[in-house]
Every structure is written in structure tokens, then in C-alpha cells.
């Protein structure tokens, strides 16, 4: 009996200890989302692959949302890990999954359909939803004018919500939601007349309109709205509170304004200047830097006139120019490229030309050996502009289309596809402003041809006297499109 009593006492003690252990375990709080981010040392963010959010160019990762969320990660003292979603439904589905992204930074607008899927931050960017049509076609001036039009918008977007609301008032209104396109695709489809109308936010139109000369704003649909970041639903406010504090601080210290100005405060115009202006620059600007072009072209074994043409395309031979994106100097070098090329002062024209020449030849040497001249030079120019990764993506697309991946004439047809979702989603490096390198190469070839012509011994005197006639370019009239190549 004594043995049974002792056994019961030991069991009771064991049960008590076990219960106490479980009770104490239950009392230990799980780490918050913010604590987990800091412990892991990684902020996992989901976004969209588009010009206004996130993409890769020759300098690496970029985009308004990327730069802002990178600053947030730096503030937290953690690394940034980016994941891209094919569409908005996928983005919200993935947000908050175990080991998945904890934050969505993708130009999101709070809406009724999303309230149960996420919690939204304080606002950081005001945008206006705009109805877009093609110039020369019938322009709607109010919501009633949307009836009978072929309309497409992003699936799951706030614009789709707006149209759904309007359809209650105008039952004849029809529209299509697509998850196979991005904003750039929608603008292109309007520009080419494939659809009548689309809806985009004002910031995305500002970034892309230069590439689509036929698109116009029909009217603003509704009032200005706010873009926000999003976190997963739940009661853990740790990350959301930190996000709000960061966004409020960025608003006060001018960080947000600087980013807005950099991405949306200007319009990049691609094209080449009129012959009169170019002739003036040949006379007034080139002589100051010609010796540097010739000297470093000789070192790198490249035609100095090609190097000068690159410099003119980049800066119009202006040594102290700085772009909104942070590239500087006559050859418009990034800080990263300048450091790699041994350039300590990007505003020093001699150093800039030296660095630009060295970098161009480095890019050219890294091209596949199967690419031969003269195509090799045009490929190198494209890679210099958009990055080698995106150029390889275009070559891959060319192969799939049974085109020659070693011929510029074929690959330049594929580069613009890198801005179209149906194509860039198949590539390794994703979205790129694929039309830019095509214009970049075309412009430089034109400048190079002119420089080759005017540097003939019998014409150099005309340049010095300012009496130069440049063939093939309309005097004083900038071209709207690059010449055929």
C-alpha cells in the first residue's frame, strides 16, 4: 500500500510539473512579426514587376517602390528580399504565408474587396485614376461615355472596382479584367488601337507616356486616392506600426518628395536634336573634349567618334549634368560603375570619358563570342544602356521566335517585348524598358554617322567656321522617332 501511495505521489508530481511546464509555455509570447524580421535579418517584400514599382536595369534593382522599401529595410538594419507576383490576386494570397513575404509594396489602393485580405499603412503617394484613350478616336468626357467601348484593366485592381461600381449605374458598360498584362501592356494596347480605353493611375501614365505617343487622358475618374503598403491581416501591429512611423518620417524629412521628383517629376524624351543644334555643339562643345575621346579611344582600341557619339547621347557633351536617377557627368556614369572603373570624380570630363570608354569595352568583351561585328558593337551599346542580363533575355526570345540571336536587326525586335508582361514573365531578368536601348543604339548610330562624315579632312574647316550642313536630319526640327536602321 505504501508503494502504491508513493507511486500516486510521483505521478501527481509529474502531472503537476507537466501542467506547469505547459502553462508556462503558453504564457511565453510568440515573437512579433517585427521581432522575427529583425531576428532573421531579412525583410521579405512582395511587389509587382513594373516601371512604377520594381524592375532591374543596367544598374541593378530599381523602381519607386523598391527604393522606398529598401530605405525601410536599411532603417531596420536588415537585408531586403524581393518577390514579384504575376497579378494582384497572387500578391494578396502570398502576403503573410509562412516563410513568405510580410509586406506588400506595390502601389496599392485600399478597397472594399481587399479589406479582409490585408491591413494598409498610412498613405505615401497621391494618385488620380485616369481614363486613357487613343488620340484621333472618339474621346469620352464622362462615365456615361464608357458604354459601348472596349475596355481592359488589371484584374483585381482598384480600377476594376471602380468599373464594377459604375456598371450598377450604367448596365451597358462592359469591361475585361486581365491578369496576363501590366500597365505598360494596357497603354500599348490603347496606343496601337487594340482596345478603346483603359484606366491607369496618374503616376504610371507620367512614367510611360513618352513611349506611347498616341495615348491621351480622356478624363479623371473620381477623386485623388492614396497608395499604401499592406501587411497581412491579424492582431499583430508591430510591423504595421513600424511602417507607419517610417512613412511619416520619410514624409517629414523630404525622402518621399525626393523620390517622387526623381521618378515622376520629369519626362525623359528620347530622340535626337536638330542639325543646327548639333552643328553648334560640334563647334562649341566637342573641341573641349575631343583630345580625351581620342586619347582613351586609342587606349581601349575603339573608334573615338563612336565614343563621342555615346557621350553626346548621354549628356550632349555637358560634363556637369546630373540626371534624376543619380547618374552624372559627360558619360553619365552611375556611382557603382564609376567606382569599378576607377573614376573618383564623375564630373571631371577626362575621368568620365576614361571610365566610359573602359566600361563600354568591358561590356563589349563580355558578349558571347558568337556575336560578330558590326552587330557586336550595336549589342554592346544596348547592353551599355539596359544591362547585359536584359540583352540576353532578348536574345533568348529571338531564339524562340526562330530569329538570329546574333543579329541586331532581329534582337532589336525582341527588346521592346521586355516591357510586355506576356513576354518578360518568361525571362530571367524580368521587366525592362526595352524600347530604350533600341532608341539609344539608333541615336548613337546617327550621331556616329554624322561625326564620321564631318571629320573628313575636307570638312573639318567647315565645322570650325560653323558653316556645317549635316545631311539626313531636318534642320532645327527634333525627330519624334529614331531613324530606321
Curated annotation (Swiss-Prot):
GO biological process, one term: peptidoglycan catabolic process
EC number of the protein: 4.2.2.n1
Active site: 314
Protein name: Membrane-bound lytic murein transglycosylase F
UniProt remark on domains: The N-terminal domain does not have lytic activity and probably modulates enzymatic activity. The C-terminal domain is the catalytic active domain.
One cellular component term from this protein's GO annotations in UniProt: cell outer membrane
Molecular function as annotated in GO: peptidoglycan lytic transglycosylase activity
Superkingdom to which the source organism belongs: Bacteria
Disordered: annotated span: 465-485
SUPFAM superfamilies the record matches: Lysozyme-like, Periplasmic binding protein-like II
Phylogenetic placement of the source organism: Bacteria, Pseudomonadati, Pseudomonadota, Gammaproteobacteria, Pseudomonadales
InterPro entries hit by this protein: Lysozyme-like_dom_sf, MltF, Solute-binding_3/MltF_N, Transglyc_AS, Transglycosylase_SLT_dom_1
Catalytic activity: Exolytic cleavage of the (1->4)-beta-glycosidic linkage between N-acetylmuramic acid (MurNAc) and N-acetylglucosamine (GlcNAc) residues in peptidoglycan, from either the reducing or the non-reducing ends of the peptidoglycan chains, with concomitant formation of a 1,6-anhydrobond in the MurNAc residue
Subcellular location: Cell outer membrane
Region LT domain, residue ranges: 268-485
Gene3D superfamilies the record matches: 1.10.530.10, Periplasmic binding protein-like II
UniProt region (Non-LT domain), positions on chain: 30-267
Family assignment from sequence similarity: In the N-terminal section; belongs to the bacterial solute-binding protein 3 family.
Signal peptide: 1-29
PANTHER family, per database record: MEMBRANE-BOUND LYTIC MUREIN TRANSGLYCOSYLASE F (PTHR35936:SF32)
Keywords: Cell outer membrane, Cell wall biogenesis/degradation, Lyase, Membrane, Signal
PROSITE patterns hit by this protein: TRANSGLYCOSYLASE
Functional description taken from the UniProt entry: Murein-degrading enzyme that degrades murein glycan strands and insoluble, high-molecular weight murein sacculi, with the concomitant formation of a 1,6-anhydromuramoyl product. Lytic transglycosylases (LTs) play an integral role in the metabolism of the peptidoglycan (PG) sacculus. Their lytic action creates space within the PG sacculus to allow for its expansion as well as for the insertion of various structures such as secretion systems and flagella.
Enzyme class: lyase
Topology of the protein relative to the lipid bilayer: Peripheral membrane protein
Amino acid at each position: 500500500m505504501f508503494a502504491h501511495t508513493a507511486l500516486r505521489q510521483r505521478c501527481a508530481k509529474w502531472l503537476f510539473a507537466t501542467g506547469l511546464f505547459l502553462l508556462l509555455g503558453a504564457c511565453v509570447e510568440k515573437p512579433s512579426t517585427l521581432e522575427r524580421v529583425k531576428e532573421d535579418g531579412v525583410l521579405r517584400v512582395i511587389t509587382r514587376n513594373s516601371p512604377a514599382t520594381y524592375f532591374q536595369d543596367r544598374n541593378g534593382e530599381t523602381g519607386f517602390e523598391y527604393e522606398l522599401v529598401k530605405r525601410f529595410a536599411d532603417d531596420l538594419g536588415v537585408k531586403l528580399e524581393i518577390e514579384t507576383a504575376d497579378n494582384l490576386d497572387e500578391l494578396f494570397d502570398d502576403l503573410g504565408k509562412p516563410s513568405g513575404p510580410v509586406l506588400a509594396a506595390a502601389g496599392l489602393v485600399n478597397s472594399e474587396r481587399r479589406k479582409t485580405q490585408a491591413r494598409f499603412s498610412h498613405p505615401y503617394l497621391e494618385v488620380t485614376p485616369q481614363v486613357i484613350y487613343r488620340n484621333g478616336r472618339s474621346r469620352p468626357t464622362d462615365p456615361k461615355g464608357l458604354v459601348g467601348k472596349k475596355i481592359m484593366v488589371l484584374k483585381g485592381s482598384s480600377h476594376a472596382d471602380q468599373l464594377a461600381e459604375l456598371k450598377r449605374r450604367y448596365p451597358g458598360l462592359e469591361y475585361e479584367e486581365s491578369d496576363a498584362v501590366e500597365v505598360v501592356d494596357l497603354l500599348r494596347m490603347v496606343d496601337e488601337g487594340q482596345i478603346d480605353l483603359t484606366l491607369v493611375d496618374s503616376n504610371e501614365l507620367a512614367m510611360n507616356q513618352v513611349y506611347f505617343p498616341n495615348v491621351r487622358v480622356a478624363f479623371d475618374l473620381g477623386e485623388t486616392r492614396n497608395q499604401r503598403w499592406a501587411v497581412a491581416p491579424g492582431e499583430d501591429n508591430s510591423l504595421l506600426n513600424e511602417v507607419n512611423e517610417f512613412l511619416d518620417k520619410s514624409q517629414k524629412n523630404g525622402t518621399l518628395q525626393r523620390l517622387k521628383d526623381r521618378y515622376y517629376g520629369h519626362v525623359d524624351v528620347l530622340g535626337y536634336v536638330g542639325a543646327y543644334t548639333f552643328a553648334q555643339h560640334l563647334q562649341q562643345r566637342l573641341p573641349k573634349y575631343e583630345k580625351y575621346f581620342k586619347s582613351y579611344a586609342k587606349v581601349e582600341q575603339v573608334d573615338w567618334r563612336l565614343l563621342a557619339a555615346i557621350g553626346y547621347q548621354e549628356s550632349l557633351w555637358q560634363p556637369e549634368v546630373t540626371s534624376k536617377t543619380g547618374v552624372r557627368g559627360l558619360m553619365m556614369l552611375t556611382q557603382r560603375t564609376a567606382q569599378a572603373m576607377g573614376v573618383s570624380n564623375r564630373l571631371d570630363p577626362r575621368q568620365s570619358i576614361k571610365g566610359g570608354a573602359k566600361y563600354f569595352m568591358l561590356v563589349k568583351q563580355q558578349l558571347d563570342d558568337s556575336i560578330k561585328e558590326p552587330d557586336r558593337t550595336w549589342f554592346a551599346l544596348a547592353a551599355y544602356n539596359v544591362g547585359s542580363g536584359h540583352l540576353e533575355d532578348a536574345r533568348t526570345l529571338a531564339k524562340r521566335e526562330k530569329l538570329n540571336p546574333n543579329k541586331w536587326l532581329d534582337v532589336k525586335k525582341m527588346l521592346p517585348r521586355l516591357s510586355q508582361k506576356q513576354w518578360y514573365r518568361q525571362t530571367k531578368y524580368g521587366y525592362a524598358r526595352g524600347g530604350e536601348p533600341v532608341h539609344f543604339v539608333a541615336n548613337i548610330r546617327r550621331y556616329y554617322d554624322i561625326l564620321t562624315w564631318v571629320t573628313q579632312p575636307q570638312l573639318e574647316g567647315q565645322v570650325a567656321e560653323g558653316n556645317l550642313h549635316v545631311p539626313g536630319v531636318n534642320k532645327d526640327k527634333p525627330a519624334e522617332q529614331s531613324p530606321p536602321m
